[in-house]
Amino acid sequence: GLINNCGILKRPDGKLIQQAFNHYKKPGATYAPEGETSKAFRKKFSHASRAVKFVGVWDTVGAMGIPISFLGLCDDKDEYYDTKIGKNVAIARHAMAIDEYRSDFEPTIWQPRENMDIQQVWFAGAHSNIGGSYKPDSDNTVLSDNSLLWMVNQAGSNDLAIEPHLKKEARPNALATVHN
């Protein structure tokens, strides 16, 4: 959504990322991707193309990938208001946690768009198991390697360059410890 509205900032304008994010969050037709304000922003600060070949994410939840009420850090203005992937994205992949029970970590399931290659796949584990933030079990495995290997394979099969060590070092184990 952010790239569809604001484009991909040119390197000298990278410092404007917060301004771009604020623009993206504003309601109204002028701030929509084809609105006049968005067009002017992209023309001034961004590369001409907004095309994105592949988006791969792990367990997007709540508001823009973070829980809305987690420790009271977020408010309604940060809620994710559009669960459709932008028309500028060709391929979208989403690894989701099937064993998460906390309401703050409920996945934001994307709504499909016509003519888009989209896959959303459930993996064993809670939110942090999917993205990988826990130490390995005694057998040196973690649940996050399951979703990592899937995402690496998806990206590679769509002609993205993948660092070889990601596949070589992954040790997928669907029976690794669930931390919830």
What are these regions (language model features)?
Residues G1-N180:
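Active-site- or binding-pocket-proximal scaffold segments within functional domains
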